[in-house]
């Protein structure tokens, strides 16, 4: 609490000024006016007085209990060792000192300090008096000798006698001075000294005495300052103890802080008490030691040695808690977090348990949870993005860009499979791409730029098959305008709706192209009506979505569609910087024999030149060559231009961004960071074993796995097939992709398929010669595909073969027992009438009595008249005998069989 005036204090406690003034007077404080200040110490004294007057009793004692459990190995009488749990319980009691006793101790210490000071002053005065008396006696003796020797002796004799007397008198004076501290010194042989030597000696002794006095005064001042600091600290602690509850002081933000201070003070006071006891020895002993000690200190000071006083222990004030600035990433390990806060990991895990999070020291927690932990422990959390290295690189590249110009639009053609997307693009390009594709469907993202009369337009052709959802999503994110192709004779289909959702999610403008208008079954109004169900209202129906009716076969409406594209591009005012480092997106990547990794990219900013250092995903390398979509070599590519580049060490992931960097060291650092992050994610996915997954895996002993090794021609197709295969998994058969990659099938793939009993599938790739020889030797069948339908259908068939068959029961016939007679051969025989179906001799039967199953077994005999027969049809009589059971009149004989039905995915 800060210093406050009496009026502010009255407002704070909602009392009148006069009432507060009366309380201050009752508490023993001087009277004050309403504008006078009340210090913090006086406020604490007032609160203590009010608590005491209201009858509140202080808690002076607090007990802390601890319990530790350990295990010990004990050898019994039989010689066998066993584990014994050992529990150790400890109890510590902390008692708050009585303020009255504390005040008495402070007063006693002050009195002891004053007495010590007086004794030191008296001893100094005694030394001065003894020295002064010795000097006076020496001066008187010298004067008397001069007077006696003033007569008729020769000058030489006078000098000798005078010097002899001076030496004798000086020896007596020195002996008298040494008797002052009551210590006898043996007489030495007198030495004759000259007047100059005597004067130098006296000067030296005076200087040494002055230095001793200065040193004694300095030590006295240091002792007084240390005593004052200790007493001030005790007064503060006494003030705190006088009005605070010791139990309440153990708060979350300063656990055991007061206890540590108290222990430090008690230890310091105990040492001071021991020093006082040792210092209360006889004054005579101290007097004998002091002079020798002072002389040693003077000699040490001259030689640069430290005094023994410097090594003496003094009480130091406890250091306050250090607040750390803790940097926290998006994910952080508990042990690392504890290390950054300079605490034990156990304390962090305990705090997490209180928050409801049960984690170990080597597990990761998110950034929000870690920030709460850091704040709870009194430190400053500093959130740091895990992509800081990438962000810094991006900022450095952005600073070098300039010269913003208009760029061509990037248009993505989307729609359902077989609705004519590629045919429309062929008509615009005047090529025949669709006829050359496997199955007549697009299975890659194709990027083309077309020079029309209205300017350059870049087209992205996406696949429409359901398995290529990720490809369509990437196409929508990298584009400026989406052309939604809908067949006039087919209408809205699932992939059409998905394309609309992708366009909305990316915020891309939409242009509807109703294709196949040349067909007689075309119904554009039905298409427009179906589009309104997805809230796509065209301009023809009063909406804001442009629409064109086209025919990719005849070319009808193509010019109108291109006009709509250019108009939309002008409204969007598409611009991009042409100078500086290039940046864009990887559309597709693949491995080609003799060329290595080939990446199809779309430049979005800047200009890409041959020889630039490109960072794409986890890989970086220099651009060795660039080609356009027709295979023609180019030297540079500006914004909105698609090209294929060579020079990367491996195929980057489709959809990842690429960036041209100038510093190879920085590129390596970012690439290694991304690769490490990807490895950690894969390892986390593989080793993730949580409680939920443990319950899911229980009871799945009969679960079957179909192991697959998949190789494709491009990265995008690989991702699409992996997602499609994962969706095929059921509760009984799981598809497990052991290995996957881009490029031809190698010998290592065949070896892996042999060891893991996996199916080896190739999509638009072939096995090399070494792989073929290895497959023939191991008897492994390699399956090749060029259409995604065939691959998925074959995997489904393989999974269906791994399913356990379904058993279904079929009732074949029912016969009623009309009479029962005895047979010497079969025992009880029944005469029956077949009322439904056919009764078979070699099939299983049930005996129903009162419509309840009484017996299940086999027929022993089936006869028609006296002939044994294998079956009896409905409406005919027969005789039968049931093996191991006696039937009765009125029973029903039900004949059935169990059929196995092979299930399919």
From Swiss-Prot:
Q: Which GO terms describe its cellular component?
A: cytosol
- Which residue stretches belong to region G1? 415-422
Would the keyword Secreted be found if you checked this record's keyword annotation? Answer: no
GO MF entries: GTP binding; GTPase activity; translation initiation factor activity
Entry keywords, A to Z: Cytoplasm, GTP-binding, Initiation factor, Nucleotide-binding, Protein biosynthesis
Q: Please give the residue ranges the record annotates as the region G4.
A: 515-518
Kindly give the CDD domains that the UniProt entry links to this protein. IF2_eIF5B, IF2_mtIF2_II, mtIF2_IVc
Asked whether the keyword Cytoplasm is assigned, the reply is: yes
Provide the protein name: Translation initiation factor IF-2
Residues annotated as domain tr-type G: 406-575
By its UniProt entry, which PANTHER family does this protein fall under?
Answer: TR-TYPE G DOMAIN-CONTAINING PROTEIN, TRANSLATION INITIATION FACTOR IF-2-RELATED
InterPro entries xrefs: DNA-bd_dom_put_sf, EF-G-like_DII, IF2_assoc_dom_bac, IF2_II, IF2_N, P-loop_NTPase, Small_GTP-bd, T_Tr_GTP-bd_dom
Name the residue ranges with Basic and acidic residues bias: 116-138, 190-230, 269-278
Annotated Low complexity bias: 165-178
Could you tell me which species this protein originates from?
Psychrobacter sp. (strain PRwf-1)
- Residue ranges for the region (G3) are 461-464
Q: Which Pfam families match?
A: EF-G_D2, GTP_EFTU, IF-2, IF2_assoc, IF2_N
**Which Gene3D superfamilies does the entry mention?**
P-loop containing nucleotide triphosphate hydrolases, Putative DNA-binding domain, N-terminal subdomain of bacterial translation initiation factor IF2, Translation factors, Translation initiation factor IF- 2, domain 3
Protein location: Cytoplasm
Positions with biased composition (Polar residues): 65-84
């Amino acid at each position: 609490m800060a210093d406050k005036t009496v009026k502010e204090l009255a407002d704070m406690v909602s009392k009148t000024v006069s009432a507060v003034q009366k309380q201050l007077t009752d508490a023993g404080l001087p009277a004050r006016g309403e504008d006078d200040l009340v210090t913090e110490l006086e406020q604490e004294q007032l609160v203590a007085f009010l608590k005491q007057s209201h009858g509140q009793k202080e808690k002076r004692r607090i007990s802390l209990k601890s319990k530790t459990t350990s295990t010990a190995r004990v050898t019994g009488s039989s010689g066998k060792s066993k584990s014994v749990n050992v529990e150790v319980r400890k109890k510590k009691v902390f008692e708050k000192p009585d303020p009255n006793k504390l005040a008495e101790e402070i007063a006693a210490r002050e009195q002891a300090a004053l007495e010590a000071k007086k004794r030191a002053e008296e001893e100094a005065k005694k030394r001065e008096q003894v020295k002064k008396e010795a000097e006076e006696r020496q001066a008187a003796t010298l004067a008397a000798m001069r007077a006696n020797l003033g007569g008729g002796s020769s000058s030489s004799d006078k000098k000798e006698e005078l010097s002899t007397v001076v030496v004798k008198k000086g020896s007596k004076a020195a002996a008298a001075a040494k008797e002052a501290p009551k210590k006898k010194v043996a007489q030495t042989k007198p030495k004759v000294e000259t007047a100059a030597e005597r004067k130098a000696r006296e000067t030296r002794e005076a200087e040494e005495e002055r230095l001793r006095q200065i040193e004694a005064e300095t030590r006295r001042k240091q002792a007084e300052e240390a005593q004052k600091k200790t007493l001030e600290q005790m007064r503060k602690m006494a003030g705190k103890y006088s009005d605070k509850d010791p139990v309440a002081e153990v708060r979350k933000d300063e656990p055991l802080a007061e206890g540590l201070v108290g222990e430090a003070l008690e230890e310091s006071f105990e040492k001071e008490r021991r020093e006082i006891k040792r210092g209360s020895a006889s004054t005579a002993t101290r007097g004998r030691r002091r002079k020798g000690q002072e002389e040693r200190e003077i000699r040490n000071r001259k030689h640069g040695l430290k005094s023994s006083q410097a090594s003496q222990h003094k009480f130091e004030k406890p250091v306050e808690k250090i607040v750390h600035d803790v940097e926290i990433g998006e994910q952080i390990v508990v042990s690392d977090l504890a290390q950054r806060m300079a605490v034990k990991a156990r304390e962090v895990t305990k705090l997490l348990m209180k928050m409801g999070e049960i984690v170990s020291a080597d597990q990761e927690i998110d950034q929000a949870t870690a920030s709460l932990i850091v704040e709870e422990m009194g430190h400053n959390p500093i959130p740091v993005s895990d992509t800081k290295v990438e962000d810094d690189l991006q900022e450095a590249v952005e600073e070098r860009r300039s010269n913003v110009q208009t760029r061509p639009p990037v248009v993505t053609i989307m729609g359902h499979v077989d609705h004519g997307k590629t045919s429309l693009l062929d008509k615009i390009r005047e090529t025949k791409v669709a006829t050359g594709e496997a199955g007549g469907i697009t299975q890659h993202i194709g990027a083309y730029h077309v020079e029309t009369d209205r300017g350059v337009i870049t087209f992205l052709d996406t696949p429409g098959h359901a398995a290529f959802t990720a490809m369509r999503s990437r196409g929508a994110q990298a584009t400026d305008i989406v052309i939604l192709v809908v067949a006039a004779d087919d209408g809205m289909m699932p992939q059409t709706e998905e394309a609309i959702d992708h366009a909305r999610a990316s915020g891309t403008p939409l242009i509807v192209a109703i294709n196949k208008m040349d067909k007689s079954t075309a119904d554009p109004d039905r298409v427009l009506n179906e589009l309104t169900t997805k809230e796509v209202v065209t301009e023809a129906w009063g909406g804001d979505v442009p629409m064109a009716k086209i025919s990719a076969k005849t070319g009808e409406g193509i010019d109108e569609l291109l006009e709509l594209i250019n108009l939309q591009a002008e409204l969007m005012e598409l611009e991009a910087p042409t100078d500086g480092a290039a940046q864009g997106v990887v559309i597709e990547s693949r491995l080609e024999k003799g060329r290595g990794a080939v990446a199809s990219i779309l430049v979005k900013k800047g200009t890409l030149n041959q020889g630039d250092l490109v960072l794409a995903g986890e890989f970086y390398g220099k651009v060795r060559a660039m080609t356009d979509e027709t295979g023609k070599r180019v030297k540079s590519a500006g914004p909105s231009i698609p090209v294929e580049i060579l020079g990367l060490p491996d195929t980057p992931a489709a959809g990842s961004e690429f960036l041209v960097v100038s510093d190879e060291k920085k590129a390596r650092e970012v690439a290694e960071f991304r690769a490490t992050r990807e490895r950690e994610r894969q390892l986390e996915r593989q080793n993730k074993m949580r409680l939920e997954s443990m319950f899911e895996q229980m009871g799945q002993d009969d679960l079957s796995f179909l192991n697959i090794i998949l190789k494709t021609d491009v990265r995008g197709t690989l991702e699409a097939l992996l997602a499609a295969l994962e969706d095929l998994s059921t509760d009984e058969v799981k598809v497990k992709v052991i290995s996957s990659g881009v490029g031809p099938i190698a010998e290592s793939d065949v070896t892996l398929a042999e060891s893991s009993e996996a199916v080896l599938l190739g999509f638009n790739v072939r096995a090399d010669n070494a792989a073929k020889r290895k497959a023939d030797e191991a008897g492994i069948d390699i399956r090749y595909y060029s259409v995604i339908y065939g691959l998925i259908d074959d995997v489904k068939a393989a999974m269906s073969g791994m399913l356990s068959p379904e058993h279904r029961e079929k009732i074949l016939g029912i016969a009623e027992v009309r009479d029962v007679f005895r047979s010497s051969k079969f025992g009880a025989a029944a005469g029956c009438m077949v009322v439904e179906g056919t009764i078979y001799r070699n099939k299983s039967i049930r005996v129903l009595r009162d419509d309840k199953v009484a017996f299940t077994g086999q027929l022993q005999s089936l006869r028609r008249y006296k002939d044994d027969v294998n079956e009896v049809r409905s409406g005919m009589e027969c005789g039968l005998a049931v093996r191991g059971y006696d039937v009765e009149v009125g029973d029903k004989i039900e004949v059935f069989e169990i059929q196995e039905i092979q299930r399919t995915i």
